[in-house]
Amino acid sequence: MDDSRLFERTVSSAIQYSGPVFDVYSDTVELCNKKTARRDYLKHRGAVAVVPLTDNGGVIIERQFRYPQQRVMAEIPAGKLEAFDTDPLDAAKRELKEEIGVTAKEFIPLGIYIPPPAILSERIYVYLARGLSYGNAHPDEDEFLDYRETPLCQLID
């Protein structure tokens, strides 16, 4: 299948905001019909997410307040890629250890999740972690969370 007719060519690009987590861009693109359109989007370095599977088939879930949603949310451990990260697997190992104090013998890549692709450039590398060992968590100083093992069947319902 030839997708070349679907591509858009960047005519101009301007950063509207630059921050520590993402940048906001406003680009002008040329469409396949030679008309132009504006594309506003967030450029993000990327992230990792880890599904920590316990020996008895549960998953360790963390809960933390998410300001944009204005509520406490249950999530799998995750974090953004840092500038020094050359391999997402290294970031996955780091985030698992920092957030819930866990190391794993095995990391299995599950794929790449692309959240709203029309407005966000972020790619989230997702891993399954098995063979867990437990230690002390060291979350970032602005991270306040708790975590607990949740049976997999409760996550599917």
Where in this protein do the model-derived segments appear?
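A short, amphipathic edge element
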Residues: 2-14
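Conserved Nudix-box catalytic region and its N-terminal flanking loop in Nudix hydrolases
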Residues: 5, 39, 49-94
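Acidic, metal-coordinating catalytic segment for phosphate/diphosphate chemistry
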Residues: 12-49, 55-56
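Short, solvent-exposed loop/turn elements at beta->coil junctions and helix N-caps
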Residues: 12-15, 111-116
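Active-site-adjacent beta-strand/loop module that shapes the phosphate/pyrophosphate-binding cleft
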Residues: 26-33, 116-135, 148
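Short loop segments at secondary-structure junctions
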Residues: 33, 54-56, 65, 130-134, ...
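NUDIX/MutT-family hydrolases
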Residues: 44-47, 139-157
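The catalytic Nudix box helix
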Residues: 61, 76-109, 127, 141-142, ...
